[in-house]
Amino acid sequence: MTPLKVVFAGTPEFARAALEAIAAAGHEIALVLSQPDRPAGRGMKLQASPVKQCAVAHGWPVAQPRSLRLDGKYPQDAAAAREALLAARPDVMVVAAYGLILPQWVLDLPVHGCLNIHASLLPRWRGAAPIHRAIEAGDAQTGITIMQMDAGLDTGDMLLREAVDIGSDTTARLHDRLAELGGRLIVQALADIGRLARTPQPAEGVTYASKVEKHEAQIDWNQPADAIVRRIRAFDPFPGANSLLDGETIKLWAAHAAPPAEVSAAPGTLLAVSDAGVAVAAAGSVVMATELQRPGGKRLAVADFLRGFDLKPGQRFG
């Protein structure tokens, strides 16, 4: 394998796994692009992204432009990034959950263009939140697609794809599995760069994975139990599915659909409470919640939760 000069663009933990895999495979990390530091945590102190933290730890050069558009809101940032990219003289640019739009001048700059690691089986779930949306929709499988980027939103030709079963995964667990797979596939793609067949994405089966908003986390108990349970899994760890109970926001972190039963109580009503779980009426079905959290508290198995919070049948989420 001939080592390549790689520019890597990414921001969250998902991208860090790929960056480390590329470096471990012997490629030169010529430059790392990541989003600017953001306020985070209870103190809202500026915090570097996981990708920047990784780059700093390894001594790789980092640029954090607010935009790459030379004619956009931050032309000085874009111009400085362009100089850094030109100086890096990359063979290829690898992009994973970067968060900035790449204008055409960026796509054209590397010898082999820009490769993207996308956490879905394209063309299903193009966009910002493919892992969450695949779980929420009840998909049996998802996976990783390595694509040759073009100017569209996740519309480029596919180079490699590999599927995984979702099973009962939460977004947190599936994220980690796909991050590892993405690292393995991008290393394979770089080893075969210039020789991989490019497959255009089919026009059929296109769906879009919109960004997850906090307001979506509020549980609608008028939905069937299966749909509610999928949403609980999809929104773990962010934003955390929740529901109001006597004026307090309770997060539900784990649940399953109870065996089919005839339910006459209003949706959201607590039907039974025990150390095994809290049974809640849904649309013609029952959700059995097994892990809960109060504001400011920890995630607790229901038996531990009930030691500090009294729940009774007849109370109602809503």
Curated annotation (Swiss-Prot):
Cell inner membrane found in the keyword field: no
GO molecular function: methionyl-tRNA formyltransferase activity
The enzyme's E.C. designation: 2.1.2.9
Binding site for (6S)-5,6,7,8-tetrahydrofolate: S120, L121, L122, P123
Keywords assigned: Protein biosynthesis, Transferase
Reactions catalysed, as given in the entry: L-methionyl-tRNA(fMet) + (6R)-10-formyltetrahydrofolate = N-formyl-L-methionyl-tRNA(fMet) + (6S)-5,6,7,8-tetrahydrofolate + H(+)
One Gene Ontology cellular component: cytosol
Primary role: Attaches a formyl group to the free amino group of methionyl-tRNA(fMet). The formyl group appears to play a dual role in the initiator identity of N-formylmethionyl-tRNA by promoting its recognition by IF2 and preventing the misappropriation of this tRNA by the elongation apparatus.
Family affiliation: Belongs to the Fmt family.
NCBIfam families with a match to the protein in the record: fmt
HAMAP family per UniProt: Formyl_trans
Stated name of the protein: Methionyl-tRNA formyltransferase
Organism expressing this protein natively: Variovorax paradoxus (strain S110)
